[in-house]
Amino acid sequence: RSNSSKIDYRGELSINPFDLDLDINLGEYKIFQLLNLNAILKEFIKTGLLFNENLSLDVSINAKTKAIDQIFQSTQINFNIVNGKLNLNDTILINDKIGLLKLANSNLFVENNRLILNTDILIDVKDSMSLFSFLNTSKKSRNKFKSALINLDYDFLTNQIEFNNVKIDNKEVSDQFLNIIDDFKDNNSNNLIKSRRLINKLLSIYEG
């Protein structure tokens, strides 16, 4: 535990070969602050020093929040290095009323001097009505669903998102759905108001 804060941490470190297993508990912390890689960390990853087969890293960061302006109330962010490959597998974001979002089959890599994350995002909806209430979805568009699977590439340099595949309740979505979801592509302009509007537009064409 840090004496100057409420941060708890524990772990094990081996030097030769380098192997770090670290669990960090931040306690009360704004979730979206954790999701923004700062410039120094981005540049460090881009150096390629972490893409080393002699490195083994398993870091878990836990946080929760009661702030009303946050979509998620708790999170566990996992950062792993295995055989020179970086991933964020099993990172999870939880909304206590609506459900959760989980990363799987992820790969963090450098391509053309850009830091790219390719990942599956698994969305598990616990309560559709709570989701519709949060989004202010019109009654005629409230077609219930239990899960969604999205595969995407995220460019940390340009903040651009490329959607590769989307399934809802294990069914492929329409081309019209894919065209609309592509409006999320520029993450620089994404905000809660825009996200609500676009998601409701998607729900209006989803037939269930």
What are these regions (language model features)?
Residues 1-208:
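Membrane-proximal interfacial segments on either side of biological membranes
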